[in-house]
């Protein structure tokens, strides 16, 4: 009968609507869960970026510290005849890796507000100046002056290392590279 067909059709439609509603709820829940998982992945990715950035900046600082040890060592090796540096061939404080970072690179752009960054310039310049003075004194065979310059170079180098170490643990150092 027509009424039976209508009732059957209505019942079928009701079940289809209920099924569609349930599927919509499931899709909504699935969408919420997916969004939560994506947020968790984004957060984890951000943490990984920060960790990698911190490791890179720490590595950069360690390389810079090592550069200064090598710089000093090269000056000393010249004194004992294992190296042939001259005062004229010694790099300036703006030419070395740290100098480029400080004056031209990301250090200038991202770390100039850090107190240790501001304190770094003078001792870094002194390391290079005293190294040059020591080599000039060696060339002139003025060993007393050379010794004084070497002592001052070491003092300045210690200050540089101290300031780099201070920046290593700061927010600024996460951006170094």
Regions found by a protein language model. Give the residues of each.
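Hydrophobic heptad-repeat coiled-coil signature
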Residues: 1-7
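N-terminal membrane-sensor/transducer module of prokaryotic signaling receptors
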Residues: 8, 12-177
């Amino acid at each position: 009968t027509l009424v039976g067909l209508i009732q059957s059709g209505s019942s079928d439609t009701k079940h289809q609507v209920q099924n569609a509603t349930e599927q919509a709820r499931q899709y909504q829940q699935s969408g919420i869960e997916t969004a939560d998982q994506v947020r968790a992945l984004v957060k984890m990715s951000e943490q990984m970026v920060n960790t990698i950035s911190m490791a890179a900046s720490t590595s950069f600082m360690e390389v810079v510290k090592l550069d200064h040890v090598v710089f000093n060592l090269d000056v000393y090796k010249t004194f004992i005849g294992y190296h042939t540096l001259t005062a004229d061939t010694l790099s300036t404080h703006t030419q070395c890796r740290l100098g480029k970072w400080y004056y031209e690179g990301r250090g200038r752009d991202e770390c100039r507000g850090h107190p240790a960054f501001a304190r770094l310039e003078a001792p870094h310049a002194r390391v290079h100046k005293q190294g040059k003075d020591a080599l000039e004194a060696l060339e002139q065979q003025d060993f007393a002056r050379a010794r004084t310059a070497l002592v001052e170079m070491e003092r300045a180098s210690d200050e540089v290392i101290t300031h780099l170490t201070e920046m290593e643990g700061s927010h600024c150092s996460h951006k170094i590279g």
